[in-house]
From Swiss-Prot:
Biological-process GO terms, alphabetical: response to oxidative stress
Protein name: Isoflavone reductase homolog P3
Uppermost EC category: oxidoreductase
Lineage per the UniProt record: Eukaryota, Viridiplantae, Streptophyta, Embryophyta, Tracheophyta
Protein's organism: Arabidopsis thaliana
PANTHER family named in the record: ISOFLAVONE REDUCTASE HOMOLOG P3-RELATED (PTHR43349:SF93), PINORESINOL REDUCTASE-RELATED (PTHR43349)
């Protein structure tokens, strides 16, 4: 007899990566719940997202991180809690942790991670402080004895591949004439399509192999340097791009001189594409790799992703 699939609550489900996780959960056959603030329903864009959730059979629960009672009530209905709250709310996840402790029924908590392994990064400010909040949440989860999985996903394909990592507002497709490469362009980065990140993450929620572990989503075809990504694109369009290298010293200077949120983005880009912070070895005592655990998931390679734009 097949094991019954867990009931999943997504907090922050109308956000960027949250939408993909809600959809993946519902499509994988989990009873899926999304905690939504009343104010979200009046937002025309997010209101449409909520309706799309309902069309998938998702149960919409009304609540708020600042309403402890609503959190506990929502959490008591599920087995797994996935948080996808944004960067400004990372530390507010202590409220989710408190509600999980009071509810007493949660088998797994996945806090808002979905990026680098924050315990193993050499990021400069302001990314360093942003990651520090996630580290604090990890330590709180562990201290409270809450069962967890940390989803370390590398970069979102939708953030980086349509622009070839170019920081140009308004750019919606890869450049066909010139490109700026960060540093020497040789540091390898992990980049995954959002739907694949969600599929792997949902697979992990009921898997004992991922309990109290870090789930690294690092399929072999999706770990490439910026130089390699540019070369793939050049082959697809049949021409060479004019390349300009931005030295690390200049990037660090730009980070210091840029306003929020540009400095945050640039410091993350420095961590990923100059330091190579997403391309780390996996320590088996606390980490597992998603594509090895779930070879049945047909992921989109970076090469295939770029073909959408060629």
């Amino acid at each position: 007899m097949a094991t019954e699939k867990s009931k999943i609550l997504v907090i922050g489900g109308t956000g960027y990566i949250g939408k993909f996780l809600v959809e993946a959960s519902a499509k994988a056959g989990h009873s899926t719940f999304a905690l939504v603030r009343e104010a979200t329903l009046s937002d025309p864009v997010k209101g449409k997202t909520v309706q799309s959730f309902k069309d998938l059979g998702v149960t919409i629960l009304h609540g708020d991180l600042n309403d402890h009672e609503s959190l506990v009530k929502a959490i008591k209905q599920v087995d797994v809690v996935i948080s996808t709250v944004g960067s400004m709310q990372i530390l507010d996840q202590t409220k989710i942790i408190s509600a999980i402790k009071e509810a007493g029924n949660v088998k797994r908590f996945l806090p808002s991670e979905f990026g680098v392994d924050v315990d193993r990064t050499s990021a400069v400010e302001p990314a360093k402080s942003a990651f520090a909040g996630k580290i604090q949440i990890r330590r709180t989860i562990e201290a409270e004895g809450i069962p967890y999985t940390y989803a370390v996903t590398g970069c979102f394909g939708g953030y980086y591949l349509p622009t070839l990592v170019q920081f140009e507002p308004g750019l919606t497709s890869p450049p066909r004439d010139k490109v700026t490469i960060l540093g020497d362009g040789n540091a390898k980065a992990v980049i995954n399509k959002e739907e694949d990140i969600a599929a792997y993450t949902i697979k992990a929620v009921d898997d004992p192999r991922t309990l109290n572990k870090i789930l690294y989503i690092k399929p072999s075809n999706n770990t490439l340097s910026m130089n390699e990504i540019v070369t793939l694109w050049e082959k697809k369009i049949g021409k060479s791009l004019e390349k300009t290298h931005l030295p690390e010293e200049q990037l660090l200077k730009s980070i210091q001189e840029s306003p929020i949120p540009i400095n945050v983005v640039l410091s993350i880009n420095h961590a990923v594409f100059v330091n190579g912070d997403t391309n780390i070895s996996i320590e088996p005592s606390f980490g597992v790799e998603a594509s090895e655990l779930y070879p049945d998931v047909k992921y989109t390679s970076v090469d295939e992703y770029l073909s959408y734009f060629a």
